[in-house]
Each structure stands twice: as structure tokens, then as C-alpha cells.
Amino acid sequence: MAITWADILDWTTGPLDSIASDLAASSKALVSAANDGQDCAAAIQSQGSAVTAIRTAAAKNMASLAQVATNVNSAMMAIEGARDGVATVMANVQSAQAYAAENHCTIAADGSVSSNAYNEDETTKQQAFLAADSLQKTVNKIIKDADQVDTD
């Protein structure tokens, strides 16, 4: 499904911020658990085959925890990248909306741009017409960028 201007207007970074925060907390907990496990395994002073087996199992478990922490960090980086993409698109939308308001233009839900300087003098109408043309290109780029963010 293609992204529309109306879809983009509903975007927010809040859910992505929340997920990134949850992943950061999970990563911290996993790293802490792996460190605690390594400390405990290192503290074992006994010798023997059972202790060697425990150390081997503990080392495998700590390596697994470290791998999970790495995976969580990778997910967190991806989420943060998506959040940055959404934030950039949102900033561009706000800029386009401000430009539209300043130049007697309207951006419709489908992303089409029109001039609304009907009751203005001829110079203002001409400027609004030119602004609408420029703004249409900007809106098209924002929609394209948003589609890329959504796809990535």
C-alpha cells in the first residue's frame, strides 16, 4: 500500500521512542546478567569434572546472553533509525505546512497542492500559483521519503 499525505499526518515518534527505551532497558539487564554470571563462574574455586562441566555450561550460557544482548542492541539501532526517519519526515511536513500557510496554498489529504489566493490581488495570486507548484514538488518528495522510511 502506498503512503499518502493523510497517512503521514498521523505519524508520531512516540511508539518508536517507547520501544527503543524498552530495548535499551532489556539490553542493560542482559549485559548485567551476563556480567553477573561471569563473575559467579569466575568465583568458583573448586576443581573436578562436575565443576568443569558447570563452568563449560555457564560459559555457553553467558555467550548466549551476550549474543541476545547484541541482537537487542541491533534491534534498538534499527528502531532508532526508523524513529529518526519518522522525525525527519514529520519536520519536513511541518515545514511544508508552514510554507503552505504563508503562501496561500492548501495541501489536500491525497498530497495534491492548490492555491487558495482567490480573493487576493493579481501579484499575490501569481506568487501563490508559483508557490503551489514548488510546494507540490516538496510534498511529492516528502511522500517519497516517507514511503522509503516505511519500507526500510
Walk through the language-model features, giving the residues of each:
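N-terminal secretion-targeting helices of virulence/extracellular proteins
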Residues: M1-T151
